[in-house]
């Protein structure tokens, strides 16, 4: 099963200069809680922005340079490799970047979205998609405070039709 986990602003922005445009510790804690013990799939640039494999997860890096080595990670060179890894019932999490979200969106079964009710400057966006193809399963309002200075909510969607039709 392929799940996406991401945070985006009011304009679907997810990144700026290969980093997050915001600092939201509660979202990082949510990400850790949801993905711990699972496989996480990321593009090369996302791995480089993190700088290391994330603990208690199987880290999988997708890169078009098949000779690349990322210590502590499994390296794959195609979307077919990702689909093979995630073909079973175990939940695999795509964690970025923007191109990987776009390429794998037709295969996504579940979306874990942190929606930040603020507008930021940046250069990477989550792909547009038709929310009518997705069922909102859970919603939790985040707590705005001095460390988390924006209004935000945690949303979880499941694809209504599992035909892999895309949902765009």
Swiss-Prot record:
InterPro entries cross-referenced by the UniProt entry: DHFR (IPR012259), DHFR-like_dom_sf (IPR024072), DHFR_CS (IPR017925), DHFR_dom (IPR001796)
Pathway where it operates: Cofactor biosynthesis; tetrahydrofolate biosynthesis; 5,6,7,8-tetrahydrofolate from 7,8-dihydrofolate: step 1/1
GO biological process: dihydrofolate metabolic process; folic acid metabolic process; one-carbon metabolic process; tetrahydrofolate biosynthetic process
CDD domains found in the cross-reference section: DHFR
Residue numbers binding substrate: 5-7, 27, 57, 114
Annotated positions binding NADP(+): 6-7, 14-19, 43-46, 62-65, 95-100
Pfam family, one: DHFR_1
Resulting phenotype, residue 165 to V: In strain: MI112
Protein name per the record: Dihydrofolate reductase
